[in-house]
Amino acid sequence: MATAMTVSSKLRGLLMQQLRGTSQLYFNISLRSLSSSAQEASKRAPEEVSDHNYESIQVTSAQKHVLHVQLNRPEKRNAMNRAFWRELVECFQKISKDSDCRAVVVSGAGKMFTSGIDLMDMASELMQPSGDDAARIAWYLRDLISKYQKTFTVIEKCPKPVIAAIHGGCIGGGVDLVSACDIRYCTQDAFFQIKEVDMGLAADVGTLQRLPKVIGNQSLVNELTFSARKMMADEALDSGLVSRVFQDKDAMLNAAFALAADISSKSPVAVQGSKINLIYSRDHSVDESLDYMATWNMSMLQTQDIIKSVQAAMEKRDTKSITFSKL
């Protein structure tokens, strides 16, 4: 590894000193720090992002380097209509290329996160495909399902960390969506429901593929899938589906934005590289993942972000004072 690094032996010594003396600073987020960030974030009025204009979602700049993507059909309980499946793909493709964005918070407007697919709007597309040849209808439906699957895969493939903030119901397609996010917070009144079996079909846009890897309990996933029962917030926390539960929506959003602000203050090279390698490691063996990591870092270890971080640590400056270049 030393061979791969193009830094001096003195700087390597500084790196070791940094790891010994400032690990808590770099790897632990204190509740006090999060509370301060949350208060600061709540004072800022969200600003519309000019190149994100949609019918079913709203994108605002919550704070510096942080975007807020909100499911925005509260009168329909944020049901996922035809526009949603197209717009979320467009939205996250833009976010992936947005060099100023370093973290994303996804939430739902109104009384709940989402009620899932909008059956009234989607019925004609799903239930009455054109044509009378079974093979051709099958190919049409396969292409349609693949298109819907991409709607949530773009979240997973987005290199910026995505935090889901869930309140009220998260039903059907909502579980597919949050399973593709990196971090999940919820309110005490939240519940999660894999509803598809009650509609006569198997969930087909990500839940069955991602949820077992998220919570690591195949028996529980099977139970939730086969029965369509509700998983309440406390059970979601115990199972590992969410990492924190909050009393109400405001407290949850404040914490989500505080975490996003903290993440966005870190090196984007380090954060985005970590997300990409975590996802790769989830789907590959340890040996394959270590090899991928070595190949990745043979380039990334040459970043100026390391030098900036070490200098800040040696000067006892807050890491938030470092100015990292856009990525």
Swiss-Prot record:
- Where in the sequence is the transit peptide found? 1-33
Biological process (GO) annotations held by this record are: fatty acid beta-oxidation
Describe the reaction catalysed, as an equation.
(3E,5Z)-octadienoyl-CoA = (2E,4E)-octadienoyl-CoA; (3E,5Z,8Z,11Z,14Z)-eicosapentaenoyl-CoA = (2E,4E,8Z,11Z,14Z)-eicosapentaenoyl-CoA
Question: What keywords does the record list, in alphabetical order?
Answer: Acetylation, Fatty acid metabolism, Isomerase, Lipid metabolism, Mitochondrion, Peroxisome, Phosphoprotein, Transit peptide
EC numbers, comma separated: 5.3.3.-
Chain location of the short sequence motif Microbody targeting signal per the record: 325-327
Which pathway is this protein engaged in? Lipid metabolism; fatty acid beta-oxidation
Intrachain disulfide bonds: none
GO molecular-function terms, A-Z: isomerase activity
Q: Where does substrate bind?
A: S115, G116, I117, D118, L119, G173
At the top of the EC hierarchy, this enzyme's class is isomerase
Which Gene Ontology CC terms are recorded? mitochondrion; peroxisome
Question: Mind telling me which residues the site (Important for catalytic activity) is annotated on?
Answer: E196, D204
Q: Which residues carry this modification: N6-acetyllysine?
A: K147, K326
Q: Do you know which Gene3D superfamilies this protein is assigned to?
A: 2-enoyl-CoA Hydratase, Chain A, domain 1 (3.90.226.10), Lyase 2-enoyl-coa Hydratase, Chain A, domain 2 (1.10.12.10)
Indicate whether Glycoprotein appears among the record's keywords.
no
Please list the residues that carry the modification N6-succinyllysine: K230, K316
One Pfam family hit: ECH_1
Subunit structure, per the record? Homohexamer.
The entry assigns this protein to a family as follows: Belongs to the enoyl-CoA hydratase/isomerase family.
Quote the function comment for this protein: Isomerization of 3-trans,5-cis-dienoyl-CoA to 2-trans,4-trans-dienoyl-CoA.
NCBIfam families reported for this sequence: PRK06142.1
Protein name (database record): Delta(3,5)-Delta(2,4)-dienoyl-CoA isomerase, mitochondrial
From which source organism is this entry? Mus musculus (Mouse)
What is the gene called? Ech1
